[in-house]
Amino acid sequence: MLLQTDQGSVMPRDGSVTRNKIMDVAQNMVLDVGLSGTSVEKVIGEAGVTKSTFFYHFKTKHDLAASLIERYAENDRHHYSDAMEKAEQLARDPLQQLLIFVGLFIEMTDKLEEPFPGCLYASYCYQSGAISADIMSNIKEMMHFWRQRLCEKIDAIVALNPPRIPIENYQVADHLLTTFEGAFILSKVMNEPGLASQQLIQCRNYIELLFAPVP
């Protein structure tokens, strides 16, 4: 993420430039060393701001953590909606729409030269004891967002293309979500940038085979 020049003790009119800079630094740090390894002092030093500037925007580390997940979730919603909207513009059939949707993420991950930096949801969940119930609730809400939206698409697919084996639609939606999240984690652990796209290809193959016409 791009970091802007520190404004020092002089705040922008809305403070958004400095606030976003602090959040960008903090998010990269959380993805790198985890929430427990991210201290206010380290964020201040990396962002090049004063303590007074930091606490002008965030009262506590918890306040910063909550703001990070709120921004991350909002971007996630837009990312999902933009990708699905594009898929729906390219095809009328729900099955093709879902295959294109997954394909857009395959295209994105296939361009990675380094493993995906990680998922903020996962980073927080691994240290759930260090964050509030409200933050965990926000993460759970986003998991339900993905599940519900994907399940709606799978419902539409099933109505036109009976699956070749018995399924619970929400479980297929969860499988998609699990593959998306797990592929990025595995790619980072194995230090193999191409692994994420490979797993998403397998996921797309599964969906295609699941709803293929019976000979």
Regions found by a protein language model. Give the residues of each.
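Amphipathic C-terminal alpha-helical segment
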Residues: 108, 112, 176-194, 208-215
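N-terminal intrinsically disordered/low-complexity leader segments
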Residues: 1-17, 158, 213-215
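Hydrophobic alpha-helical segments that form the core
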Residues: 117-118, 122-123, 167-186, 202-206
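Hydrophobic alpha-helical connector segments
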Residues: 67, 82-116, 169-176
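Helix-turn-helix
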Residues: 21, 25, 29-71
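Amphipathic alpha-helical segments used for helix-helix packing
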Residues: 112-134
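Amphipathic, non-transmembrane alpha-helical scaffold segments
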Residues: 15, 23, 69, 73, ...
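Amphipathic alpha-helical packing segments from all-alpha helical-bundle domains
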Residues: 77-78, 96-103, 116, 132-159, ...
